[in-house]
């Protein structure tokens, strides 16, 4: 049984733990014991994961970013009267370090100079969730960052410390991006009418 793409929050998507994602498959290939442990243990996002989520939200759901995030003022001191007042007004938001404001500006300039800017130039949808009850005997899911309306183009944004061809090639192997790409293509082949051309 195949499900058509669904619109849901990131939290709802990750809450569907009966379905395997590319992340869980990569864990199985790396360490089956860690995979089984993570299935039952409470997940605590690392700082890198939280920053990655912020970057994705900035580029893909900018209005949501404005509602959920804020930047800590430079030379912030939470012990002062002004600092305490600022925390009272912004404590309900996800607070990013002051330098992240400038980082995102530089990232945006780089992004607009890359092929990934197609997400602004072509019709498509962000953060759609795809589910399959039987992907080779596995309940599967995937959530591409962006997919074109004709399903011919899929974009998944990645942050990296080294954007050179050699540096990013190393990241591909280190983080299993090639496995993720294959998983996404297979999921979309099963769940999207136009995905034959994509895969």
Question: What are the language-model segments listed below?
Answer:
Residues 190-199:
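Single conserved hydrophobic/aromatic residue that forms the stacking wall/gate
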Residues 1-142:
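Metal-dependent nuclease catalytic cores that hydrolyze phosphodiester bonds in DNA/RNA
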Residues 144-167:
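Conserved catalytic cores of phosphodiester-cleaving nucleases, focusing on short active-site segments
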Residues 168-175:
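Short, contiguous acidic/charged loop-to-helix segments that flank catalytic cores in large enzymes
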Residues 178-187:
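An active-site-proximal "capping" alpha-helix that borders the catalytic cofactor pocket
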């Amino acid at each position: 049984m195949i499900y058509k793409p669904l619109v849901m929050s990131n939290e709802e998507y990750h809450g569907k733990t009966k379905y395997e994602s590319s992340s869980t498959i990569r864990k199985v290939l790396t360490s089956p014991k860690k995979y089984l442990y993570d299935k039952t243990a409470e997940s605590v996002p690392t700082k890198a994961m939280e920053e990655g989520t912020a970057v994705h939200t900035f580029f893909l759901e900018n209005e949501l970013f404005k509602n959920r995030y804020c930047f800590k003022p430079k030379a912030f001191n939470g012990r002062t009267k002004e600092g305490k007042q600022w925390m009272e007004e912004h404590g309900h938001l996800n607070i990013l370090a002051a330098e992240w404001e400038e980082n995102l500006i530089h990232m945006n300039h780089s992004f607009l100079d890359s092929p990934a800017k197609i997400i602004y130039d072509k019709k498509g949808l962000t953060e759609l969730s795809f589910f399959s009850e039987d992907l080779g005997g596995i309940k599967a899911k995937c959530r591409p960052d962006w997919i074109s309306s004709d399903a011919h183009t899929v974009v998944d944004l990645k942050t990296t410390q080294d954007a050179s061809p050699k540096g990013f090639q190393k990241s591909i192997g280190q983080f299993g991006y090639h496995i993720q790409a294959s998983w996404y293509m297979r999921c979309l082949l099963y769940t999207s009418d136009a995905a034959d051309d994509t895969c």
